Amino acid sequence: MKRNSLILIGLTLGLNAFAQSNEPTDRPGRLKKDISYLASDELKGRQTGSPEEAMSANYIANEFTKAKLIPQTQTFEIIQLRMATNKCILGVSAPGMDTVVRKFVLFKDYYPISQSSNTDSVRAEWYDCGYGLVSEKLKRDDYGTVNISGKIAVIRLGYPGMEENPHSELAEVADIQTKISEVLKRGAVGIIFIKPYEKFIAPSGNLKRNEKTLNVPIFFCNQTYTFPQAPITMSSKIRVFKADAHNVYAYRNNHKKNTIVICAHHDHIGINEYENSRYTGSPEIHNGADDNASGVAAMLEMARTLKGKKYKKNNYLFVAFSGEELGLLGSKHFVQNAPTFLNNTSQKLGKINYVINIDMLGRIDTTKKVLTLNGVGTSPEFEKSIALITTDTNQLKITTTKSGLGPSDHASFYLENIPVVHFFSGQHEDYHKPSDDEALINYQGMANSLSVLEQLIVLNNKKGKLPFTKTQDAQMGRTKFKVTLGVMPDYSFNGKGMRIDGVSDGKPAQKAGLQKGDIITKLGDIDVNGVEDYMVGLGKLSPEKPTNVVIIRGAETLTIPVSFQ
């Protein structure tokens, strides 16, 4: 659902609530005013699709208006929750009869898993597919010449001998997604997974709201029941709860050919409704001061100040996205449904010169004083310009990475062949925790960083539309990770390897003994020279197969086994 209009979200936050007479006159003061509101308990963490996210959008619209811009909203629909209902059925017919003679009990005996269709039902004969393993490399095919088209596939999880040999090469083809793909290629109309042994960890019954669903019912059955040679009935009835989320944008039209997009996401993770938190305690508001009230405040500051003659070589589009924390939903929707003034006659989004994404700018470390600019490899002009930027190195040092991909909204534009730069002050221990509060923001560090942003624009003013370059790790953004290690990379680290900037409680890294400051040099079979290599290595791991991580800790090189079970 798409709707572009003057923002009317049904709230009563009038302009009088933010009277011009109370506006701070200094940049750090204006940044503090914005962050103090957006990261207040009143907004309850700005969860995408929540009333408080709408309040955030309304505040941003009001600030655009005060900057003499016309705010627009773009509303899009998100899935908040998927929940199996009591209309789900798993049952067995008597041989030769249509009547279901045994019904399994939902959540006691079975449940749908995330990949299952929301609505499909089927009644069919079943076939025992064993472990459902197919590997050309290992010369194994559990299906052989058997035709399972039109049948329900019953498949054991894992692989044979898994308890005794967790490092078997069979683990490479034993994950659930691979098994599903293999059985659907063969025409199965339903899938039932069962445990190979009692202690095997079952797949989660918590349905992922953003999982790509398939057009067949897919269940896990936790009973050691032997199905008779009779038809099985499967009916997947999953209720889907939806809500509206809000992108907000405003356009400064300087009547030029090209437009610079300056963006930030305004959503955060609420009270951890979607389990995105790194915090393991009882529910608390995650205010998201750095992530990303800081980015929104910086974007609003640019909307107020990019007015002078030296900035009029381009038009500007200021955008606050929602749904970033749920998978870049808002920016993906925006590039698919962009305002027509961004298109030229030959290319969708063709009038966009480049994109500056501001995500987590509020925690410039007072010791390191590092500002990271990600994506500078997406145009040859960026590195040339950055080399000419002047900063007091006692106040701010600039480090760069080349990749246009990453877990933030600039990636959505990069994948449309648009140059991007991501302004980032670095990871910290408060990331995705309730402790990411306004009191910890470094406002002078933010102001210094915005001076860099302004210089970047001016230095590129005479170059016209910047050429685009695809970075070498272009496929990395499409990697689907089956596991998480639970570490935060230190993006300011320029040495060989990937230095850990934080370790999440209860995750595999912590359980294995990895520590902040460790430098990962090898993950599984992949040598790690930087964050990009680490991501490639992570994408090759599966939950069923432990791996080794080689690290440098002080003067020692250690090999540490890690399990994902």
Regions found by a protein language model. Name each.
Residues 33, 41-164:
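Noncatalytic luminal/extracellular "stalk/propeptide" segments of secretory-pathway proteins
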Residues 119, 255, 311, 321-422, ...:
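Metal-dependent peptidase/peptidase-like ectodomains
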Residues 521, 536-565:
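PDZ-domain C-terminal substructure recognizer with occasional recognition of PDZ-binding tails
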Residues 297, 304, 308, 429-475:
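His/Asp/Glu-rich mid-to-C-terminal helical/loop segments that flank catalytic regions of hydrolases
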Residues 26-51, 67, 72-75, 198-199, ...:
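N-terminal capping segment at the start of a domain
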Residues 472-516:
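PDZ/PDZ-like groove recognition
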Residues 23, 95, 109-141, 145, ...:
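Soluble metallo-hydrolase cores and metallopeptidase-like ectodomains found primarily
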